[in-house]
Swiss-Prot record:
Transmembrane segments: none annotated. It comes from Clostridioides difficile (strain 630). It holds the Pfam family SmpB. Keywords: Cytoplasm, RNA-binding. It is found in: Cytoplasm. PROSITE patterns: SSRP. It comes from the Bacteria. GO terms for cellular component: cytosol. This is SsrA-binding protein. Required for rescue of stalled ribosomes mediated by trans-translation. Binds to transfer-messenger RNA (tmRNA), required for stable association of tmRNA with ribosomes. tmRNA and SmpB together mimic tRNA shape, replacing the anticodon stem-loop with SmpB. tmRNA is encoded by the ssrA gene; the 2 termini fold to resemble tRNA(Ala) and it encodes a 'tag peptide', a short internal open reading frame. During trans-translation Ala-aminoacylated tmRNA acts like a tRNA, entering the A-site of stalled ribosomes, displacing the stalled mRNA. InterPro entries: SmpB, SsrA-bd_prot, SsrA-bd_prot_CS. GO terms for biological process: trans-translation. Belongs to the SmpB family. GO terms for molecular function: RNA binding.
Length: 163
């Protein structure tokens, strides 16, 4: 995917304006499958998200009664929202197709799998969430990944040093 940055520091990827990312997710989990889903928001939450005041790092999604909910995602209250602001850690419904929800129900019943948010972005003026079906990494897996990245960096350094 081609990443384009504008003057204001906004990041665009394939027609999407990325508002927030979960950087810890790819370090702590093996990503099996990703889903794009809509999110049910109140008016002041949308304004706050557009300002980039979102924290996805502690968030997760769960399936309850054939509905998917996003939990522990912190959206800061909108400064000019006064009485219209809602709880910053409230549970938010995710909008998916029925067949996708059925797949997620089957997958999350397997031990070790969970649903985590990867990014929050604007697509055609709508706020979308990219969630992933993920399996937690063990400590030795994290060390192995860091060793691979370190070796790759060394190789690149050597290649640029020779030419």
């Amino acid at each position: 995917m081609e990443q384009i940055s504008s003057k204001e520091g906004e990041i665009y990827m394939a027609g999407k304006k990325i508002l927030a990312t979960n950087k810890r997710a790819r370090h702590e989990y093996f990503i099996e499958e990703t889903y794009e889903c809509g999110i049910e928001l109140k008016g002041t939450e949308v304004k706050s998200i557009r300002q980039g005041k979102v924290n996805l790092s502690d968030g997760f999604a769960s399936v309850d009664n054939s509905e998917v909910f996003l939990k522990q995602v912190h959206i800061s209250p909108y400064e000019q929202g006064n009485i219209f602001n809602v709880d910053s850690l409230r549970v938010r419904k995710l909008l998916l197709h029925k067949h996708e929800i059925r797949k997620l129900i089957g997958a999350t019943t397997i031990k070790g799998y969970s649903l985590i948010p990867l990014s929050l972005y604007l697509k055609n003026g709508k706020v979308k969430v990219e969630i992933a079906l993920a399996k937690g990494k063990k400590l030795y897996d994290k060390r192995q990944d860091m060793a691979k990245k370190d070796a790759q960096r060394r190789i690149e350094r050597e290649m640029t040093g020779k030419y």
